[in-house]
């Protein structure tokens, strides 16, 4: 497992954010919801934006979804090339949710959330939803560190991967609009016909 430059800073930041050993009750429940379940609220928000959106907004959402898949693929590659232990594997700090002992850098949860958050923010007509997604992404990122399954640098890496993935996919927007968006529109129409017939 890799030891990052500035590892002492990474661990110091982690210990400053990580929850105390006696965390319980509502605080623990809130942190677990933030860490593990806001991703489902984001999915519901994206579905709502897709159904209610204009065709150009759905085309952009499709592009962002492709960027998210690319981001998660990059995470797999990064994890293979530069594996880094999770806090409980060191061990350091306190851990409150179970997790497999696998590489921590970057965080898949945070990468997914930040890719959609930046993506939604990037289209002016979806920016208000983007603000909500940014709050969700920030809370999820905090929760992953607070509950002891990620280091702060894992989250920072996720934010960078999210931006890079969006930048890499953006030049392919014309191809996505021409080839993939029509298929997505047919799926969209089929969903509406099925639900509202």
Residue locations for each model-derived region?
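Interfacial segments of alpha-helical transmembrane regions
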Residues: 44-74
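Membrane-embedded catalytic cores of phosphoryl/pyrophosphoryl-handling enzymes
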Residues: 97-197
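Hydrophobic, aromatic-rich alpha-helical transmembrane segments
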Residues: 26-30, 57, 61, 65, ...
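Alpha-helical transmembrane segments of integral membrane proteins
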Residues: 30-37, 63, 128-135
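Short helix-capping/hinge motifs at transmembrane helix termini and TM-loop junctions
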Residues: 52-53, 82-83, 147-151
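N-terminal transmembrane-helix/juxtamembrane module of multi-pass inner/ER membrane proteins
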Residues: 1-40, 76-102, 180-197
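Membrane-helix interface segments
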Residues: 24-26, 55-60, 125-131
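Small-polar-interrupted transmembrane alpha-helices in polytopic inner-membrane proteins
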Residues: 65-80, 130-143
């Amino acid at each position: 497992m890799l030891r990052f430059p500035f590892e002492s800073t990474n661990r110091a930041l982690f210990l400053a954010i990580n929850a105390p050993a006696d965390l319980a009750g509502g605080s623990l429940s809130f942190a677990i919801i933030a860490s593990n379940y806001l991703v489902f609220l984001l999915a519901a928000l994206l579905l709502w934006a897709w159904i209610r959106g204009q065709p150009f907004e759905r085309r952009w959402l499709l592009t962002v979804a492709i960027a998210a898949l690319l981001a998660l693929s990059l995470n797999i590659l990064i994890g293979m090339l530069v594996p880094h232990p999770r806090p409980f594997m060191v061990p350091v700090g306190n851990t409150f949710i179970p997790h497999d002992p696998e590489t921590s850098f970057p965080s898949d949860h945070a990468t997914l959330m930040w890719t959609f958050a930046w993506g939604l923010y990037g289209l002016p007509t979806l920016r208000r939803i983007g603000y909500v997604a940014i709050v969700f992404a920030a809370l999820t990122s905090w929760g992953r560190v607070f509950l002891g399954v990620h280091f702060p640098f894992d989250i920072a890496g996720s934010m960078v991967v999210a931006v890079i993935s969006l930048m890499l996919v953006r030049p392919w927007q014309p191809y996505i609009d021409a080839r993939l968006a029509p298929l997505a529109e047919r799926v969209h129409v089929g969903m509406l016909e099925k639900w509202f017939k």
